[in-house]
Structures are given as structure tokens and as C-alpha cells.
Swiss-Prot record:
Family classification: Belongs to the GrpE family.
Gene, per the UniProt record: grpE
Principal cellular location given in the protein's record: cytoplasm
Compositionally biased residues, Basic and acidic residues: 1-11
One GO BP annotation of this record: protein folding
CDD domains per UniProt: GrpE
TM annotation in the entry: none
Record carries keyword Chaperone: yes
SUPFAM superfamilies: Coiled-coil domain of nucleotide exchange factor GrpE (SSF58014), Head domain of nucleotide exchange factor GrpE (SSF51064)
Record protein name field: Protein GrpE
Organism: Chlamydia abortus (strain DSM 27085 / S26/3)
Region Disordered: start-end pairs: 1-22, 172-191
């Protein structure tokens, strides 16, 4: 029987030995560790993507709220400017009108305070170099008193939040005077 069992073992070499079992188990452990690492990496990637999406959505929501507030406040700019102009004339009126103007001026200051709290500030343009990002030129004026492209008059104020204008200022811009000479000389030069 020993001869036959030896012959049987020789025919069937897949009988596990303790060393083979250990090797197989170590291989299986290594494979499982690699799979676990891969799944953990995928989990961390999905978690990071989810966190980024959450932050992006939160930022978009905040921007939408900010734009909604801006748009609502922008609608008040024209009436506020009208009130400022009217209050400018109050100093020429009777004492009773001046007293009323003081009250309206307080209300105007409250509006301006709300604007500042929301980050909306007006900017002055007179004396500044024309910037198409901040200004809309509605008129030009020939002059040698200031360099060409300088704003000489402001028709309506500009407003911005941070560096972003929400309403550009409407201005008059200086330009260099036309060359001196008679019309006939200018026409002859053009021909």
C-alpha cells in the first residue's frame, strides 16, 4: 500500500504542503490588500469630489444671493441720485425746506450705509484717466487744460462692488483740440 500511495502522490502533485499553503495565503493577502487599497483610493476620490461639489454649490448659492441683493439695490441708485440732486438745491430754499432737507438727508445716509454694508461703493471719476471698464463717455470736450483722455465732468456716478463695476459712470472726456488753420487749409491738406 505504501508503494501505491507513493505512486498516487507522484501522480497527483497538487497536494498542498504547509509551505505552499503559506505562500498561497500570503499571495491572497497581498491581492486583498491591493484591492482594499484600490477601493479605499476610489472612496477617497469620490469623497473629495463630493466635498468639492458641495463647496461649489455653496459658492454658487452665495453668488446667486449676492447678485440678487445687488440687482435689488441697483434699482435704488437712480432715486437716490435724484434725492441727492434735490437736496443740493435745498440750501437755496426757505428755513422750513432746509429742515425737511435735513430729515431727507438722514434717510439718504441710511441708504448709503446699507449700500456700504453690502459692499456697494460709489467712485469718483473727475480728474481720472478714462477707463472703459469704469466709464461711459457720453461727451468729449476739446481742451488743453488737462491731458487728453482725462475725465472733466461726471453726469452720473459709477458704483462697484470690490473691483467689479455694477454701474459705470457716465462722463465727459477731454480730447486734444483740432489743429488750427482755416477750413481751406485743412481741406487742401486732406486732398
Amino acid at each position: 500500500m505504501t508503494d501505491s500511495s507513493n505512486a498516487h502522490e507522484a501522480e497527483n502533485p497538487t497536494v498542498p504542503t504547509p509551505d505552499n499553503e503559506i505562500q498561497d495565503l500570503q499571495q491572497e493577502i497581498a491581492t486583498l490588500k491591493a484591492e482594499l487599497k484600490e477601493k479605499n483610493d476610489k472612496y477617497l476620490m469620490v469623497l473629495a469630489e463630493s466635498e468639492n461639489a458641495r463647496k461649489r454649490m455653496q459658492k454658487e448659492r452665495q453668488e446667486m444671493m449676492q447678485y440678487a441683493v445687488e440687482n435689488a439695490l441697483i434699482d435704488f441708485l437712480v432715486p437716490i441720485e435724484s434725492m441727492e440732486k434735490a437736496l443740493g438745491f435745498a440750501s437755496q430754499m426757505s428755513d422750513e425746506v432746509k429742515n425737511w432737507a435735513l430729515g431727507f438727508n438722514m434717510i439718504l445716509q441710511q441708504f448709503k450705509q446699507v449700500f456700504e454694508e453690502k459692499g456697494i461703493v460709489e467712485y469718483s471719476s473727475v480728474g481720472q484717466k478714462f477707463n472703459p471698464f469704469l466709464h461711459e463717455a457720453v461727451e468729449t470736450e476739446e481742451t488743453t487744460k488737462v491731458p487728453e483722455g482725462t475725465i472733466v465732468e461726471e453726469f452720473s456716478k459709477g458704483y462697484k462692488i470690490g473691483d467689479r463695476p455694477i454701474r459705470v459712470a457716465k462722463v465727459k472726456v477731454s480730447k486734444a483740440p483740432a489743429p488750427q488753420g482755416t477750413e481751406a487749409e485743412i481741406e487742401n491738406n486732406n486732398e
